[in-house]
Amino acid sequence: MWLAILLALCCLTSDTHGARPPDFCSKDLISSVKPGFPKTIETNNPGVLKAARHSVEKFNNCTNDIFLFKESHVSKALVQVVKGLKYMLEVKIGRTTCRKTMHHQLDNCDFQTNPALKRTLYCYSEVWVIPWLHSFEVPVLLCQ
């Protein structure tokens, strides 16, 4: 008799119909955001645009081209929390009319329109940002 009453009470107080409630410390918890996993982020996010600019600046410092390149479009962006933020970007960059010998603001540089000088590259870059140290690193930059 007591067993029947106890079972009835358990069924009445359980809103999960016998299913186990989620344990917030277990791996069974279903979530769309998992700490440490890369997450898609809007390509027009200010952090993404700043990371893309750092990628282009690294590209400009590593090439012998006489003209500066700048980003024209970010097609894909992921962000991962790892002692700061790691951005993983797919960026289209293009040659500008600004020469490296002059110190230009990239925002003021127009893209080349001369077919002989026009050049577009598609890049994958990873940019590690540590905001509290005002630090930007570009450990991965692949362009073709």
Curated annotation (Swiss-Prot):
Motif (Secondary area of contact): 80-84
Residues the UniProt record annotates as site (Reactive site): G36
SUPFAM superfamilies xrefs: Cystatin/monellin (SSF54403)
Glycosylation sites: N61
Subcellular location: Secreted
Keyword Glycoprotein recorded: yes
TM region(s), chain numbering: none
Major site of localization recorded for this protein: secreted
Gene3D superfamilies: 3.10.450.10
Record-linked InterPro entries: Cystatin-F, Cystatin_dom, Cystatin_sf
Signal peptide location: 1-18
GO biological process, one term: positive regulation of myelination
Pfam family, one: Cystatin
Single GO cellular component term: Golgi apparatus
UniProt family annotation: Belongs to the cystatin family.
PANTHER family according to UniProt: CYSTATIN-F (PTHR47141:SF1)
Function: Inhibits papain and cathepsin L but with affinities lower than other cystatins. May play a role in immune regulation through inhibition of a unique target in the hematopoietic system.
Protein name listed in UniProt: Cystatin-F
Species this chain originates from: Mus musculus (Mouse)
Lineage: Eukaryota, Metazoa, Chordata, Craniata, Vertebrata
